């Protein structure tokens, strides 16, 4: 693992995955990827982690698929004990590396914190998380404190055209055709 801050720390950091448990005795680690295709996480370099509030560059020596898992070998990490120190570290890259999206496609990171409002003007709350369900993505919306329907959280499908009527990332606003009581 490189102790240098070279390459530069990401200006626009985004978490693409997480280092999991150790694998074997030679310093390998499992990796949990948040990219659509799990192996795509290796297309984005350099990797960084934060430990005790400090950025560290992580240089990969090797990676491979093992059964259903992805495992990595980090340069300079040669035993289980050293690898154990990296367990649960988030894998961070600069978001400027992500490809441009087509119209009506959004990165989840860009939707976080957006206010969700119905077509009738009712404020449902803010997006705090996104979930993948297989058939479609779902917004997890934290309701406003004084929600008229007593809701704390809502799950709203991210179906463009059907439910999602307008997304304005500049205004941090998503307009939906959704019953606030549901």
Swiss-Prot record:
It comes from the Bacteria. GO terms for cellular component: cytoplasm; ribosome. Coiled coil: none annotated. Its main location: cytoplasm. The keyword Transit peptide does not apply. It is found in: Cytoplasm. GO terms for molecular function: ribosome binding. Residues 102-182 form the PRC barrel domain. Keywords: Chaperone, Cytoplasm, Ribosome biogenesis, rRNA processing. NCBIfam families: 16S_RimM. Belongs to the RimM family. PANTHER family: RIBOSOME MATURATION FACTOR RIMM. The PRC barrel domain binds ribosomal protein uS19. Binds ribosomal protein uS19. An accessory protein needed during the final step in the assembly of 30S ribosomal subunit, possibly for assembly of the head region. Essential for efficient processing of 16S rRNA. May be needed both before and after RbfA during the maturation of 16S rRNA. It has affinity for free ribosomal 30S subunits but not for 70S ribosomes. This is Ribosome maturation factor RimM.
């Amino acid at each position: 693992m490189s102790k240098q801050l070279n390459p530069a720390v990401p200006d626009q950091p985004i978490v693409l995955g997480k280092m999991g448990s150790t694998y074997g005795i030679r310093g390998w680690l499992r990796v949990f990827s948040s990219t659509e295709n799990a192996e795509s996480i290796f297309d984005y370099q350099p990797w960084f982690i934060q430990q005790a509030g400090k950025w560290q560059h992580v240089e990969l020596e090797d990676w491979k698929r093992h059964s259903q898992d992805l495992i990595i070998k980090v340069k300079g990490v040669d035993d289980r004990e050293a690898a154990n120190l990296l367990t649960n570290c988030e894998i961070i890259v600069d978001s400027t590396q992500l490809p441009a999206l087509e119209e009506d496609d959004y990165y989840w990171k860009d939707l976080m914190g957006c206010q969700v409002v119905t077509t009738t003007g009712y404020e449902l709350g803010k997006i705090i998380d996104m979930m993948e369900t297989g058939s479609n993505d779902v917004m997890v919306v934290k309701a406003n404190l004084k929600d008229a329907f007593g809701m704390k959280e809502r799950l709203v499908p991210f179906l463009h055209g059907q439910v999602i009527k307008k997304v304005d990332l500049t205004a941090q606003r998503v307009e939906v055709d959704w019953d606030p009581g549901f």
